[in-house]
Amino acid sequence: VCSSDLIYKGDYMENVLDGERIIKVNIENQMKSAYIDYSMSVIVSRALPDARDGLKPVHRRVLFGMHEIGVLSNRPYKKSARIVGEVLGKYHPHGDTSVYDSMVRMAQEWSLRYPLVQGQGNFGSIDGDNPAAMRYTEVRLRKIAEEMLVDIEKDTVDHQLNFDDSLKEPIVLPTQFPNLLVNGASGIAVGMATNMAPHNLTQVIDGTLAYIDNREIEMDDLIRIVQAPDFPTGGIIYGYEGVKSAFETGRGRVMMRGDITVEESSTGKERLVVSSIPFQVNKAEMIRKTADLINDKRIDGISDINDESDRNGMRIVYDLKRDAIPNIVINKLYQLTALQSSFSVNNVALVKGRPRTLNLKDLIHYFVEHRHEVVTKRTEYELKEAEKKAHILEGLLVALDNLDEVITLIRASQTPEEARNGLITKFGLTELQARAILDMRLQKLTGLERGKIKNEYQ
């Protein structure tokens, strides 16, 4: 636009030729406003889980999309690319990589304590290997994921329009178990982050039942039931102060150790066997760095390292030198390698759209509150459906009690509309009841079927 085409009018400039208007703003205020909008979008729509179902929008959309096309635990697998296309085209227009990566993580047994997706094919490894491309892998929902979607068709949760206003998607899932406590979550937002540990399902359910029985239950009583995090890679929690702090305040540092045992080889030499490693530790990277420490003489007493892990479980073998003392080598491994790592708990989740730091009791409270709302809505839906059915059955019973008159009226009518209007006028039926009578199959007129209708109505 040429400067000669612009007319200055107070706080804005008007383009005479194109009818455009350029508003003058303070750049500091504009940047502040734009940054707040961006940060809230990341916090609410991307990085933080909802306290009710423990899911971020992308995970929720993947599970809902799989449920909608019927990729259930008792059905055949479907190509991952098919699911990604479904979710991308209908609910999550932010690139196929984000959708596929989220789905892959939900299928990895070393990433989630209770995986929600069952994968077939190469979904990566604990060594940091990348999964195969989505065109090669296949997925379906696990049974536990289906428990998160039970009764979703019964108006149990609120829905919102998708990105192009063509479909509706759930704002939250009506999950039947506290997924946020059970599987944890992690995410980096703008100005805040969340890092929540997974826990044992049985303990969490027992803790939830204890809270339902006594809403004023003391934190110490809850902690006796939900004892500590339960990481998918196993391992040992070293020290309890960090765990207790995480339960009580929503923040804490949990120290994790790999499980090491001493064995004797067939040649009579001692060796250390690692059967589990801390959560979120890359096994191959840990072994490589340990080898570097041995070569640099920072760890003495180890002659060789072998990774004998297979589909039956993890097994990393450290062959010891003849003069090595196992306990000293174990302490060195914990001190210098990732066999001892920490997990910094920061329980930040969305409560009514706002980020909050939650302790153990808060997490259980918001889940129970959510389930109360879900069960209430389900009951209201089922009552409404039962009333609709009773209304139709009332009409059918009227027709069966006046069968000869109804048949005569229908036979005398020239069109379905005429028959429907005649039924409404003569028997005081509603349009819904009249339609049901006209749609009724002739077999309903038998004595047995008439008895069934009466019993169903009663």
Feature names for model-found ranges:
Residues 8-250, 315-317:
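Catalytic phosphate-handling regions of large nucleic-acid enzymes and associated NTPases
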Residues 7-12, 18-20, 27, 186, ...:
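C-terminal interaction appendages of subunits in large macromolecular complexes
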Residues 1-3:
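Short, small-residue-biased leader/transition segments that mark boundaries at the very start
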